[in-house]
A protein has these predicted regions:
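Compositionally biased non-globular segments, especially hydrophobic aliphatic-rich helices
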Residues: 2-5, 28-29
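N-terminal compositionally biased, intrinsically disordered segments and leader/signal-like regions
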Residues: 15, 26-27
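Hydrophobic alpha-helical signal peptides and transmembrane signal-/tail-anchor segments
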Residues: 6-20
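N-terminal and secondary-structure boundary signal
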Residues: 27-240
Length: 240
């Protein structure tokens, strides 16, 4: 896999973001190429998916050697009842380009810590299917990166890691030859916003990895206020 800097802790994320902003404001950067397209769709099929294919080729995907390689396309399949995730059509556009280049793509994400529709591989897959992500719609298999219960992981040493010495990453992510992050911008209650960094740094973590990253927010029981209602136990996905 190509070397990617991963942020494993929200404190590190904020520090990294501040340093990045400082660098952007103090250094003279090379002008970026800006591409424009409209939202018009023509009868010949020249719509947004086709325009997206052209964009990712221009961005450099077409220059990669993908022949015969396993290509992990990391994305978020959305929770049930949520419609703010990327559409399957966009994932299909990336998959098609990877196939054109001889790659062997698969969509992937790792299980979540919190109770919901993505806390184990079975529910995660059903959630993805109901939200429109199926092998027929996206054109490739869907693999949950850290396995059935989030225990299929690889420990990756973090050089000089202050908070995490060994990151726990989903095995399917680490086994891939090429890694592509397909992410969307969203708000976050602690970091302010989430995008590509969170999609990789948090999203590729196994269940243990995510637990480690959230250690600063461990729940606690105030025994003097507990009434024994059991609501906390009902809402814990891991029976802690």
């Amino acid at each position: 896999c190509a070397k990617i800097q991963i942020i494993y802790n929200f404190k590190q994320f904020i520090l990294f973001f501040r340093l990045l902003c400082k660098k952007l404001t103090t250094n003279v950067m090379e002008k970026a190429k800006v591409y424009f397209t409209d939202f018009r769709t023509k009868a010949n099929g020249d719509g947004l998916p086709t325009k997206l294919k052209n964009l990712i080729k221009k961005a450099g995907l077409a220059d990669l050697d993908l022949e015969g390689k396993f290509v992990a396309i990391k994305m978020h399949f959305g929770e049930l009842g949520n419609i703010s995730y990327l559409r399957p059509n966009y994932a299909r556009a990336v998959v098609d380009v990877v196939k054109e280049l001889g790659g062997r793509p698969f969509l992937t994400d790792c299980n979540t810590l919190y109770p919901g529709s993505r806390k184990n591989a079975l529910e995660h897959l059903y959630c993805a299917w109901e939200n429109g992500f199926t092998p027929l719609t996206v054109g490739c298999p869907i693999l949950i990166g850290d396995g059935l219960k989030g225990t299929d992981e690889v420990e990756v040493p973090v050089a000089g890691g202050e908070y995490v010495e060994k990151a726990k990453i989903g095995r399917a992510v680490m086994d891939a030859d090429v890694f592509i992050s397909l992410s969307h911008f969203k708000g976050h209650e602690e970091a302010g916003f989430g995008g590509a960094l969170k999609n990789i740094g948090m999203g590729c973590g196994s269940t243990r990895g995510k637990a480690e990253m959230h250690e600063s927010e461990k729940p606690a029981v105030h025994a003097d206020q507990c009434v024994g209602c059991g609501v906390c136990a009902e809402n814990c996905a891991h029976w802690a």
